[in-house]
Swiss-Prot record:
Family recorded in the similarity comment: Belongs to the heat shock protein 90 family.
Gene Ontology MF terms: ATP binding; ATP hydrolysis activity; ATP-dependent protein folding chaperone; unfolded protein binding
Predominant cellular place of this UniProt entry's protein: cytoplasm
Name of the protein in question: Chaperone protein HtpG
Cellular component terms per the entry's GO annotation: cytoplasm
NCBIfam families: PRK05218.1
Organism in which the protein naturally occurs: Ehrlichia canis (strain Jake)
Region (B): 335-558
Alphabetically ordered keywords of this record: ATP-binding, Chaperone, Cytoplasm, Nucleotide-binding, Stress response
Pfam families to which the protein is assigned, alphabetical: HATPase_c_3 (PF13589), HSP90 (PF00183)
């Protein structure tokens, strides 16, 4: 350890203290993770210097063999991890180790407080970039000595994790470029100065790190602990399942095994290699707006970035792994990556390949595909909302699977649906809702189910968006059943025999009574509805809401109101079922006695019922309750 001068004691940022406490006490069952995090940080430091040296060769000063060296002092119970990467100066040490300078700190604290599993905590540690502090799980004191590339003065940072740290200048100006971390281990953590224990941890977590990891033995010799080659440079046959598992865990920071592996070497107009994984477990922050892509971009095995590059679209953000291209210049700036034509071509190729593999899996093993769909189906459908050409949208829809009124709990494709369409049926019908159980009970489905017409059941929030963007599939229009009342008139030949018989029994007098009641209902409900009509879709329920063709979907309108993007609530059409006992008696009563207060109350109650079934808020809950009470009083008189 170097002698120091000009020492200054500083306090940790307040949030760091909280993170330290939580990390130390949350990972006590999985302490190995500290070494993985420190090695990962060392690798990042080498990546950064390698990247910076592309535009400034003087930074590496002839030392181009990047490496990470681990050594121990068993007598003093100390563990050392050193690298010859970018290094840090005084301000870097304060910024990187004394504060957490990103907005996700509080989210990390909230998330880790709510996480119960050890593996879940490990995932959080990696995701929020606070892995350095895990060193305090095993160390009573941590000392960081570092000299930044291109600078002559080195600095020391040391702390016991007690809320303070000391920054000093290294007296010896000969400290090598890079960083050396000294862990003064706690007495009970002496296992971490054992060479075999260290080797096991490196093999488990850091075997495929981009730089050689050495162990400095008692003879002063460096023994290599990790792989010679980047795993993605090997052929598919050369990579074992265990190697995939190790690499997947190192890049994904999630538990479980990869659900799908996509390893391809593309040698066409654009040359690149991709090694991508789809996890079998859904990440905790999949839907967080700040979630970034977890696919790293390399150029000839030189790490470039994993931030701010849309090489993987947001709707494939569940992908983990790397893309390595030889068709990008090594000195490409991160800013120019955004509009790079090679990047765009790689993106299109990756999307096409992923969708193709997903479609194959869905066709060959729907039970296994269902696991993927339950984890990531709603994310994949986000792509349907994006601006894309028809070919890509059709491919994306081909990979989608849906529940339907005919499929119980199994999933179907739109191709399956089209093959089963009834004679005279021109549309793919769908209905959106909150969950499968409630949507299957919707009155909107009754007329379709009674005719044997299949309806796609959509239960993800994103479904309300993409169904407003996608109008057809394979030139077959998509149509919400809420707008499809008139369609059922054309499909009357599909009615069940008893329904056909009932239709034939209708006489002109009954039609006049119904028409008169409809006019009365319009008069009573007035501005609360845009119209009242006899439903062609209801068979068991008395009423439902409907919207006219060209009108906004009910659920979509409600979402926009909740997001303050709409400041009005449109009126809906009330559909009535004259064959339902309640409505039938109301029609007869109006025909015999004319309007009265009870009928008035009943109409308002039926409108309220229709609104509730569609998830709409009642305009006046107090009036609804009062009308309900008045009707109940009449019942018991």
């Amino acid at each position: 350890m170097q002698d120091v001068v000009n020492s200054e004691k500083l306090k940790f940022d307040a949030e760091v203290g909280k993170v330290l406490k939580l990390v130390i006490h949350s990972l006590y069952t999985n302490k190995d993770i500290f070494l993985r995090e420190l090695i990962s940080n060392a690798s990042d430091a080498c990546d950064k210097l390698r990247y910076e040296s592309l535009s400034n060769q003087d930074l590496i000063d002839g030392d181009t063999d990047f490496k990470i060296v681990i050594s121990v002092d068993q007598d003093k119970n100390r563990l050392y991890i050193s690298d010859n990467g970018i290094g840090m100066n005084r301000q870097d040490l304060i910024d990187n180790l004394g504060t957490i300078a990103h907005s996700g700190t509080q989210r990390f604290l909230d998330a880790i407080n709510n996480e119960t599993s050890s593996q879940g905590v490990v995932e959080l540690i990696g995701k929020f970039g606070v892995g350095f502090y895990s060193a305090f799980m095993v160390a009573s004191e941590v000392i960081v000595e570092s000299r930044k590339a291109g600078e002559s003065i080195g600095y020391q940072w040391r702390s016991a994790g007690d809320g303070e740290f000391i920054i000093s200048q290294l007296e010896d100006g000969q400290f090598p470029r890079g960083t050396k971390i000294t862990l003064i281990l706690k007495t009970e953590e002496s296992e971490f100065v054992d060479k075999f224990r260290i080797e096991h941890i490196v093999t488990t977590y850091s075997y495929h790190i981009n730089y050689p990891v050495y162990f400095l033995n008692d003879a002063g010799e460096e023994e290599k602990l990790n792989s010679d080659a980047a795993i993605w440079t090997k052929s598919k046959d050369e990579i074992s399942a265990q190697e995939h598992q190790n690499f997947f865990r190192s890049v994904a920071h999630v538990g479980g095994e990869p659900w799908m592996i996509l390893h391809n070497k593309n040698e066409g107009v654009i040359e690149y290699t991709n090694l991508l994984y789809i996890p079998s477990i859904k990440p905790f922050d999949l839907f967080h707006p700040d979630r970034k892509c977890s696919v790293k971009l390399y150029v000839n095995k030189v790490f470039i970035t994993e931030d701010n590059v849309q090489i993987i679209p947001q709707y494939l953000r569940f992908l983990k792994g790397i893309i390595d291209s030889s068709d990008l210049p090594l000195n490409i700036s991160r800013e120019t990556l955004q509009n790079n034509k090679v990047i765009e071509k790689i993106k299109q190729s990756i999307v096409k390949r992923v969708l193709s593999e997903l479609k194959k899996k869905a066709e060959n093993d729907i039970n296994d595909y269902k696991k993927f769909w339950e984890n990531f189906g709603s994310v994949l459908k986000e792509g349907l909302c994006e601006s894309m050409n028809t070919e890509f949208r059709e491919e994306l829809l081909s990979a989608c699977r849906f529940y339907s009124t005919n499929s119980d709990d199994s999933l179907i494709s739109l191709e399956d649906y089209i093959e089963r369409m009834k004679e005279g049926q021109d549309n793919i019908y769908y209905l959106t809702g909150n969950d499968l159980d409630s949507i299957k009970k919707s009155p909107q489905l009754e007329g379709f189910v009674s005719r044997g017409i299949e309806v796609i059941l959509l239960i993800d929030p994103v479904d309300d968006f993409w169904t407003n963007v996608v109008t057809d599939y394979q030139r077959v229009p998509l149509k919400s059943v809420i707008r499809a009342d008139e369609d059922l008139e054309k499909l009357a030949h599909l009615k069940k025999d008893e329904e056909v018989g009932e239709s034939k029994d209708e006489n002109p007098d009954s039609k006049e009574k119904v028409d008169a009641f409809v006019k009365y209902a319009i008069q009573v409900l007035d501005k609360l509805v845009s119209g009242v009509r006899v439903s062609k879709k209801l068979t068991n329920s008395p009423v439902c809401l409907a919207v006219a063709d060209g009108s906004m979907d009910i659920r979509m309108e409600r979402f926009l109101r909740e997001q303050k993007q709409l400041n009005y609530k449109s009126t809906k059409i009330l559909e009535i079922n004259p064959k339902h006992p309640i409505v039938s008696r109301m029609i007869d009563e109006y025909a015999n006695t004319g309007e009265n207060a009870v009928l008035d109350n009943m109409l308002h109650l039926l409108l309220g019922q229709a609104c509730i079934l569609e998830g709409e808020e009642l305009e006046d809950v107090s009036s609804f309750a009062e009308r309900m009470n008045n009707v109940l009083v009449k019942v018991y008189q």
